Every structure is written in structure tokens, then in C-alpha cells.
Amino acid sequence: MFSDKTRNLSRKFDQEHHYTLKKVLKYKQFCNYFVKRKKIPSLFITGTDTNVGKTIVTRAILQVLAQHNFSVVGYKPIACGGDDDLPTEPNQTDYTSEDNSDVLIILDSCPQPVAYRDINSYTFTHSSTPIFAALDAVHHIQEEKLDTDLSNLQQNYPNVVVEGTYGWLTPINKDLSFAEWVHKNNMPAVLVVGIKEGCVNHALLTAQAIQQQGVNLIGWVANRINPCLRHYAELIELLSKKISAPLLGQIPYIAQPHKKDLTSYIENPDPLLAYFQK
């Protein structure tokens, strides 16, 4: 039989041990909560269509952030080439090439050297790959791979600028769209509007869809893709009144913008800087 003194000591030890264990558990819960709350700032660049200038705007934003001393990297989850032939069989690899022009422009725009596969999860030569991936007919693009690659970048860089593929509602696979993936990852969006005939309808529908998805639209960028377009100024004025997010900048029709310093064209960077300074 144990003495009263021994039993008291044992009880005291159990109480202290239980108290310490509770403190450890509470500390772990706090850390987990803080990690969830303190997400690495990531920004998603989407567009009204394909070939509206998402990559050029991504370059401009990367350059602006670097100019303001942010450590930043770009990420193009899914890159598709210009081959319009229909894919006839499933891809055997996530990379049918490593020379996609969009990814290479983003590589060149990052303020520090990164590898191709660090900033891209899938590269396909066929432009129609997302359509057939959505039908689960060619290549099932894995959401987990996108999440892992984004997380790896977030662990190494304080700020990540992500460029989408085609438009806002483009499918990633048969179960998921870019809109849903962006919402899941709690990223705000910047909308790129290619200024051309018919762009008002495309811009307003896309802005509406972004906000209906519950994604914060930080702002929009006008990219002049038709140098002969009449009433350019009037279109900008109309879009500025109709889109409930600020105009961040206007990129003119210029030769080889992927080789230029585009920082001066983002004339209103404050909404971007405010987000990344949080």
C-alpha cells in the first residue's frame, strides 16, 4: 500500500503533467490557427479571354512588386501551346515540352532565378488540352499537384503572382474550374481586359462572375490589343464606371512588351501594394 504522502505526490504530478499537456495542446492549436490565418499573399491574374495579355500583365505586376522591394515569384500552373490539332491519345508526361512562351516570359520577369518546373505544373503543346481534360478524355490534371506546387513556392517566396489559363471559368479538370481553385486558395484576382470590339460585355460578365464566386477583385488592367480601335478612351471611361474595382493601369500596343520594363504602365499600384503589405 502507498503512503498518503506518496499518493499526494503522485496526484500532484498528474495534475502538473495534465496542466503542462493542456498548455502544449493550446499552443499547438494557436500555431495552427495562426498558420491558417497568416496565409502567404498570392494573387491570381485572369482575363476576359485567351490572348488578352495576361502574361504581359503578370510581367508588369512582377516588375512593379520587385521595384517596391517585394520578394516575389510568378507561377503558371497550366501552360498550353499553339498547336491547334486535336490530341489523339493521353499524355504520358506532365511536360510535353519546357519551352512554353508564357512560362519563359514569367521566368524572365521574376527578380530572382527560378527553374521552369518550379513555376509551372503542366505544359502541353495542344491549345485544346483544357477542353479535353475537362471531359477526362486526354489528361486528368491533378488539383493536388497544383496545390503542392503553389505551397512549395509559398514556402520559399513571401509573395506569389499566379497566372491563369484562358478565361475565368476555364476548367482545370472534369471536377474543378480555375474559379473554384482560386476561391479554395483564398486568392484575390486582377482582371485583364483586352481592349477590342465587344470587350465591354466580356469584361462585365467576367467581373460579375469573379465577385459571384466570392473572390475579391482587387482591380483590372486594360491591355490595348487592337491599335486601330476607335473610341479607345471612351471604352476605358465606360469600363471604369461599370467595373466596381479600380483601374490599375493601361498597357499600350507596343512591340515586344515581353522584353520591356512595364512598370510605368501600372499607374495605380496602390491596391496591389496594400494587399501584399498585409
UniProtKB/Swiss-Prot annotation:
GO biological process, any: biotin biosynthetic process
Species this protein is from: Haemophilus ducreyi (strain 35000HP / ATCC 700724)
Family annotation (InterPro entries): DTB_synth_BioD (IPR004472), P-loop_NTPase (IPR027417)
Gene Ontology CC terms: cytosol
Main location: cytoplasm
Pathway annotation: Cofactor biosynthesis; biotin biosynthesis; biotin from 7,8-diaminononanoate: step 1/2
Cofactor: Mg(2+)
UniProt keywords, alphabetically: ATP-binding, Biotin biosynthesis, Cytoplasm, Ligase, Magnesium, Metal-binding, Nucleotide-binding
Name used for this protein in its record: ATP-dependent dethiobiotin synthetase BioD 1
Gene Ontology molecular functions: ATP binding; dethiobiotin synthase activity; magnesium ion binding
Binding-site residues for ATP, renumbered to this chain: N51, V52, G53, K54, T55, I56, D102, N223, R224, P252, Y253, I254
Quaternary structure and interacting proteins, as annotated: Homodimer.
E.C. no: 6.3.3.3
SUPFAM superfamilies: P-loop containing nucleoside triphosphate hydrolases (SSF52540)
Main enzyme class: ligase
Organism lineage string: Bacteria, Pseudomonadati, Pseudomonadota, Gammaproteobacteria, Pasteurellales
Catalytic activity from the UniProt record: (7R,8S)-7,8-diammoniononanoate + CO2 + ATP = (4R,5S)-dethiobiotin + ADP + phosphate + 3 H(+)
